[in-house]
Amino acid sequence: MYQETQPEEFEELKRAEHLLFVSLKYTKTTDVMKNLIRRLINAYDYAVIKALTRMKEKGRIKDIPLSPLSRAELLRDLTKKDADMIDFLSLYFMFRRVDRAEYTKKEEFRKNVTLTVMDEGEFIEIKIDTLREYFNKTKGFINYIKENFS
């Protein structure tokens, strides 16, 4: 039986959604929170590749860089007049810094589990509600790419 496949960014978003609404509901650990952030990063990476591929097809760029960070920086440079894109990519860069940073756990296995990270000189407290916001913004980015680069 033929089953239509979805683009990779939507698959990663589904996995992130499961982590957010199922796994975190029952486990409430910072490891699940970090995995969710990694899934959001992967969804961004696939969407950035999609946007750059469309730009390459239209002749705006010659080559697509190999590293995810270089691809995102190139997309940011090519769309620097687009405030929405700048906001979305700023969140992506923050995700990458959070993923690589040292972190502390607070109230793990409890309702208010918190992942605290030092980012650019300030502490960021990531809670489940914060992750919901990040998930929704990532979803918005993927839809933005789909609407503007398809």
Sequence positions of predicted segments:
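Long, charged low-complexity segments
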Residues: 58-142
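Short hairpin/turn module used for nucleic-acid contact or packing/dimerization
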Residues: 2, 138, 147-150
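N-terminal interaction modules that seed assembly of large macromolecular complexes
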Residues: 25-58
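Short low-complexity stretches enriched in small and charged residues
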Residues: 1-5, 52, 92-99
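A generic "alpha-helical surface" signal
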Residues: 7, 34, 38-41, 129-136
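Charged alpha-helical initiation segments
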Residues: 1-35
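Amphipathic, well-ordered alpha-helical segments in soluble domains
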Residues: 12-19, 39, 46, 134-137, ...
